[in-house]
Amino acid sequence: MQIFVDADACPVVGIVEKVAKEHSISVTLLCDTNHVLSSDYSEVIVVGAGADAVDYKLISICHRGDIVVSQDYGVAAMALGKNAYAIHQSGKWYTNENIDQMLMERHLNKKARRASGKNHLKGPRKRTSEDDEHFRESFEKMIHMAMDKEN
């Protein structure tokens, strides 16, 4: 098992690395040339800038049983299609049971924005320590579940 993080503007990289290190699981952070990262623990892969370049690279290297951390529903759907696990930075698990509805809602919201002429959305609220703790707990559960299924 390996952990892959869609790391462009991802607020939980530190938590992912800490938890992964506690379980001796390797982590790969993927980012584009606009968000270059460095890490003492993780492998960092920098992908050329371009729409979805990081997403396609991540999906090309993840495998069955790996864990993908991403806020992108499309990446999550492709990871699930490869029988990998996927988790949002909020701690919500993407599953085969919920991904279709999430993708449909994203599509309908995009359509509504186009129709109304509103293309700029308000950003997410400021992240709290409770958000971080919720993600850590959910991520830990996912790791344990994946490890149990691996054995």
Question: Which residue ranges define each predicted feature?
Answer:
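Nuclease catalytic cores that cleave nucleic-acid phosphodiester bonds
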Residues: Q2-N151
